[in-house]
Swiss-Prot record:
The keyword Signal is assigned to this record: yes
Region forming the signal peptide: 1-23
EC class: oxidoreductase
Recorded GO MF terms: catalase activity; heme binding; metal ion binding
Organism encoding this protein: Francisella tularensis subsp. mediasiatica (strain FSC147)
Name of the featured protein: Catalase-peroxidase
Length: 741
């Protein structure tokens, strides 16, 4: 029924932007394109170009001007200042703002780190027009006077999350803290939110399983359809979809129960418009609304269009008799009332009790003295009927204080998961407690290495017997786990020495162990030799080793470079590392080292390279010079010679580009190996090289070829080496928020 209601709202034709998220069963706009048509848009930082802020604007600096206590007071005052153009249910906007924050943060997915509250994407299409976000345009509009007052000192993305957090506190639910630090985007991103961009509310579930790339069971929803799978009131099926959807954003069963039960303690849902009048009464979503509506959508011509006539999801009612106060009445009602399937006025499947007592009745949101029966969603009842969820609903029902504590922790995780490590947090309300989902690294309790120490360590590495290739690949494998989407991964923490990273196929565990053993030996000897408290971490030593490898490779090619090195990384422990969570950082392919696990078809490999480069926050020239340099350095996965287009493997030079663009070589597809190309000498007919689609894309794609030609030109040999060194250092520094703020 929700799908029917959504269609009636005029949203069935809304198109969502495609994505470059790589999944075997993901439909994207590149699926039917040839390799030379690879989409490079993920490498263009259009948000920076589109930003109206001054070039020297720094949010962290601007934030220092913010009076956070006054901001909080203004937010608290706003909650009970009901506006005629959108009256507050029960005289309090708190539940409305909780939904705003939840739906903003709840788009996060652990698979690729996309979504979440960071960057304020809910302000833009397609998220601002999703069916599940119906009427949240009004919530953001209610916040505008506060945003206008405080200006650049607070971002929209921080303000939206703060609104829900302050609302919780004002209604009796004490949060464990709040961190500022989210920065705003200035346009909608290209995330692929579902399998079928052509039809809103299309299912992302196949054979009962949620497609691995997504965190919502239907396009246009944050998690699941509250009526049940595909709008059918199937409690068992709803439980399965809830578990899959919440797990896709990194939530456990316990956290899932806490969030749903806690969130549905507050507010109401809206489906007041009769089913036969919905299509005529409700206008299009914001991105299709008439210009005179000024960005507000879902205009409602039924009755007053708001208040008791509000139309939202189509479900209608409240869960508890105290919808603006924290308690555990949701759980009390869940277990002590008998629930019967009914329909809302709008025709949506919901449940009402057959044995409600006067104390269970819910006050009308706008008419004093009027009472209604409480409601439950199909998804709410799943928390009772599913054995896994029931364990925690019973536990929370019997232990209200534990329920409160677990909700507070789950809310903090929900609203901060995509912010990355704690070092990115700013503001006065940061909780002291560390959580494993923050990927914590220990603080350095020792003196950092000096310039003289670094020189000594470099010599120790040179004398270790490790090859340049071993050092370079280990450093790359460590640092290249970084994801700019949720700021996870990177070299800090040295988690390449821990499970699960040490066992990943792409890291070649047996070879990795040889390198790590030698570096640990150097680390131990150095640390034991220092009496002044100076120490070096394995994380720093891995990066320093990569730098040594690059410097030595450049020297062998006739170039003297000094790689920058910034110490300060520390080593995480296995106890600080969530194995299941970190496995999502494992890549299916890494074109920089010509690696693939076989799950990505050969014609998609160039696009996965772009996706990988985007995750590393690289631009087109940086990606290009790194691939060319890595091929010349001969650091491919499993010693593959694909793309090693040089007669001096291991030397840092521009041979890859020179030979790729040399017309004396003719390229042909191999008839023996899929995804392999053979470079044949045009005169002799003999094989000269082998290459992958990733290699050849730099001569095939016009934009990439233009950059490749720059690096192949006479006179640009030193430029190539210098640019490689800069790009390499950038990758090694990804995740070093301790020195970048």
């Amino acid at each position: 029924m929700l799908k029917k209601i959504v269609t009636a709202l005029g949203m069935s034709g809304m198109l969502l932007a495609s994505s470059n998220a790589i999944a075997e069963d993901t439909t994207t706009k590149n699926d039917n394109l040839s390799p030379q048509s690879v989409d490079l848009s993920p490498l263009r930082n259009l948000n920076k170009l589109d930003s109206p802020m001054d070039k020297d604007y720094n949010y962290h600096q601007a934030f220092k001007k913010l009076d956070t206590e006054q901001l909080k007071k203004d937010m608290q005052d706003l909650l009970t200042q009901s506006q005629d153009w959108w009256p507050a249910d029960f005289g309090n906007y708190g539940p409305f703002f909780i939904r705003l924050s939840w739906h903003d943060a709840g788009t996060y997915r652990i698979y690729d780190g996309r979504g979440g509250a960071n960057r304020g994407q809910q302000r833009f299409s397609p998220l601002n027009s999703w069916p599940d976000n119906v009427n949240l345009d009004k919530a953001r509009q209610l916040l505008w006077p506060i945003k206008q007052k405080y200006g650049d000192a607070v971002s929209w993305s921080d303000l939206i999350v703060l609104a829900g957090t302050v609302s919780l506190e004002s209604m009796g639910m004490k949060p464990i803290g709040f961190a500022f630090g989210r920065e705003d985007d200035w346009q909608g991103d290209d995330t692929n939110w579902g399998l079928s961009p052509e039809e809103i509310m299309s299912s992302n579930v196949r054979d009962g399983k949620l497609a691995p790339a997504y965190a919502a069971t239907q396009m246009g929803l944050i998690y699941v359809n509250p009526e049940g799978p595909d709008g059918k009131p199937d409690i068992k099926g709803a439980a399965s979809e809830i578990r899959q959807a919440f797990r896709a954003m990194g939530m456990t069963d316990k956290e899932t129960v806490a969030l749903i039960a806690g969130g549905h303690t507050f507010g109401k849902t809206h489906g007041a418009v009769p089913e036969d009048k919905v299509k005529q009464a409700i206008g299009p979503a914001p991105d299709k609304a008439p210009i005179e509506q000024q960005g507000l959508g879902w205009h409602n011509s039924y009755g007053t269009g708001n208040g008791d006539d509000t139309m939202g999801s189509g479900l209608e009612g409240s869960w508890t008799s105290t919808p603006t106060f924290w308690n555990h009445d949701f759980l009390h009602n869940l277990y002590n009332l008998d629930w019967k399937k009914t329909l809302s006025p709008a025709g949506a499947h919901q449940w009402t009790p057959t044995n409600a007592k006067p104390e269970n009745m819910v006050p009308d949101a706008h008419k004093p003295g009027v009472k209604h029966k409480p409601i439950m969603f199909t998804t709410d009842l799943a928390l009772k009927e599913d054995d896994g969820f029931n364990k925690y609903t019973q536990e929370f029902y019997n232990n209200p204080e534990e329920f409160k504590e677990e909700f507070a922790k789950a809310w903090f995780k929900l609203t901060h998961r995509d912010m990355g490590p704690k070092s990115r947090y700013i503001g006065p309300w940061i909780p002291e407690q560390n959580f494993i989902w923050q990927d914590p690294v220990p603080a350095a309790d020792y003196k950092q290495v000096s310039t003289q120490d670094i020189a000594q360590l470099e010599q120790d590495i040179i004398n270790s017997g490790l090859t340049n290739q071993q050092l370079i690949k280990t450093a790359w494998d460590s640092a290249s786990t970084y994801r700019k989407t949720d700021y996870r991964g990177g070299s800090n923490g040295a988690r390449i020495a821990l499970a699960p990273e040490k066992d990943w196929q792409m890291n070649e565990p047996a070879k990795l162990e040889v390198v790590l053993t030698k570096l640990k030996e150097i680390q131990t000897n150095f640390n034991n030799s220092k009496a002044d408290g100076t120490k070096v971490s394995l994380a720093d030593l891995i990066v320093l080793g990569g730098n040594v490898g690059v410097e030595q490779a450049a020297k062998q090619a006739g170039y003297n470079i000094q790689m920058p090195f910034v110490p300060g990384r520390t080593d995480a422990t296995q106890a600080q590392t969530d194995i299941e969570s970190f496995n999502y950082l494992k890549t299916k392919s890494d074109g920089f080292i010509n690696y693939t696990d076989g799950s990505v078809s050969a014609d998609k490999l160039p696009q996965t390279l772009v996706e990988k480069a985007s995750m590393l926050d690289l631009n087109i020239p940086e990606m290009t010079v790194l691939v060319g340099g890595m091929r010349a350095l001969d650091v491919n996965y499993d010693n593959s010679q694909k793309g090693v287009l040089t007669t001096t493997p291991g030397q840092l030079n521009n041979s890859f580009f020179v030979n790729l663009l040399d017309m004396s070589t003719q390229w042909k597809k191999s008839d023996k190996k899929d995804g392999e190309y053979i470079g044949i000498d045009r005169k002799t007919g003999k094989q000269k090289w082998t290459a992958s689609p990733v290699d050849l894309i730099f001569g095939s794609n016009s934009e990439l070829k233009a950059v490749a030609q720059v690096y192949a030109e006479n006179g640009n040999e030193q430029k190539f080496v210098n640019d490689f060194a800069k790009a390499w250092h950038k990758v090694m520094m990804l995740g070093r928020f301790d020195v970048q703020q």
